[in-house]
Regions:
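Charge-rich, low-complexity N-terminal segments
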Residues: 1-34, 82
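Short acidic/polar mixed-charge low-complexity motifs
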Residues: 30-33, 41, 86-87
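A short acidic-to-branched-hydrophobic micro-motif
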Residues: 36-51
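Short small-residue beta-strand/loop micro-motif enriched in glycine and branched aliphatics
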Residues: 44-47, 89, 99
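Short, internal acidic amphipathic alpha-helical interface segments
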Residues: 48-87, 93
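Ampiphathic alpha-helical segments that act as solvent-exposed interaction surfaces
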Residues: 63-64, 94-127
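Short, highly charged C-terminal tails/helix-capping segments
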Residues: 122-145
């Protein structure tokens, strides 16, 4: 199944019209903004988890590296720092040919659950009362599912 067909089928499963013609589609899943992106034979899902804590981010970076080891703390995804904005990102690939609408929905749901755990973890690394740059906002323009 190609990306556009998968996105249309996913929309059918959700009861909404989704368009993957531009090679990407954004969904808000349980408050987590998830981008589904065409990566050739692969489906890439990714999300911006926000800025690392300003004071001593080394502890968070250590936790990220340990979580990435054998994907034990990421549900098979990868945590990274974006070179463009310095934010923490979570990303995961899977083969398009292995997915149907039901499988894609499950894949995205599980990814969003993992992302939500990391969003909460990032908040725990911030000092009490600090307002970090919350990358997840209700005005993202993403379709809420």
């Amino acid at each position: 199944m190609d990306f556009e067909t998968l996105i249309a089928a996913l929309g059918g499963k959700l009861g909404v019209e989704l368009d993957g013609a531009d090679g990407a589609c954004g969904l808000a899943v349980d408050g987590v903004d998830v981008v589904l992106q065409d990566a050739g034979d692969l489906l890439l899902v990714h999300t911006d988890l926000g800025e690392p804590p300003p004071q001593d981010p080394a502890a968070l970076f250590q936790a990220m590296l340990e979580a990435n080891f054998l994907y034990g703390g990421t549900g098979g995804a990868t945590l990274a720092i974006s070179p463009s904005d310095g934010h923490v990102h979570l990303q995961k690939y899977t083969w398009l040919e292995r997915l149907d609408a039901e499988g894609a929905l499950l894949f995205v749901d599980r990814f969003a659950e993992t992302a939500a755990r990391w969003i909460a973890l990032l908040a725990d690394y911030r000092p009490a009362g600090a307002d970090g740059d919350d990358a997840q906002s209700s005005d993202s323009g993403f379709l809420t599912v």
